[in-house]
Regions:
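FIC/Doc superfamily catalytic core
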Residues: 1-195
Length: 195
């Protein structure tokens, strides 16, 4: 038996039809998948930081970034999820809520509603809360936050300074901070993002 689709306890497992979207036949273990995804994420991040797009707070960019981060590994990369999850909103609301979030974030930037770090952390949290994709939501949202900070002339966040992919105390602190942010308490998530 392979551990390929074994997720950390607090992660959202892929539906069978989403698992079928794996493009790489050589990926047979979780470690293989982690390597393949990280290589793809690195390519996507390099593209995004080079692009320096002014219009990054758009649905089109949200989808394009996810595709650039995961498209070499998954056929569904850059497409909204169509399956229910134990976290996130109903699939039929994803497009509307993502569009609304991008509009809100553009407003926050234009009107300096929040300090840059809080603004980026709120964008990250709301994207994770919506959970638009079958997988990679946290990694995508953290990169969106860092890209926004770059646009605002602020250094990227450290997000705890380690891997959040495995079940560790670091991931537990991250998930706990996200849950507090679900109740509009952003203090712990802001602190975590800067640690």
């Amino acid at each position: 038996m392979t551990d390929l689709f074994q997720e950390p306890k607090d992660a959202t497992p892929l539906a069978p039809e989403e698992r079928d979207g794996l493009r790489l036949s050589w990926v047979t273990t979780r470690a293989d998948l982690n390597v393949a995804e990280q290589d793809n994420i690195d390519k996507g991040a390099a593209w995004a930081f080079r692009a320096r797009r002014r219009d990054m707070l758009t649905v089109d960019f949200v989808l394009q970034l996810h595709k650039r981060m995961f498209g070499d590994v998954w056929t569904w990369a850059g497409h909204y999820r169509r399956t229910e999850r134990n976290i996130g909103i109903a699939p039929y609301l994803i497009g509307v809520q993502t569009s609304q979030l991008m509009g809100d974030a553009a407003y926050w930037v234009q009107h300096e509603t929040y300090e840059p770090i809080e603004l980026a952390v709120r964008l990250h949290h709301k994207l994770v809360f919506i959970h638009p994709f079958p997988n990679g939501n946290g990694r995508h949202a953290r990169l969106m936050a860092d890209l926004l900070l770059q646009r605002l002339g602020v250094p990227a966040l450290s997000w705890g300074g380690g891997s959040l992919n495995d079940l560790t105390a670091l991931r537990r602190a991250y998930v706990d901070a996200l849950r507090l942010a679900d109740r509009e308490d952003y203090e712990a998530l802001i602190a975590f993002a800067q640690s």
